């Protein structure tokens, strides 16, 4: 698992109605900036700390051992989706 800073979109701007609570596992879809495709692997995010109302420090990672873990490294920026809806942006710490 990697640590990431997540910037959640406000509900009024198309984000989630409720940001996942601390230690609740969430399964969004991830698109890494610069990649042409959305990664279709089981992906997990667990918020560990709220920095502000719409910012969290979270643990992220792929569930499967054969997933492209090498793509998750410090400095990588990404977008999170729930279905086709963009809900957050983030960067790996």
PLM segments and residue spans:
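C-terminal effector/interaction modules appended to NTPase cores
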Residues: 1-93
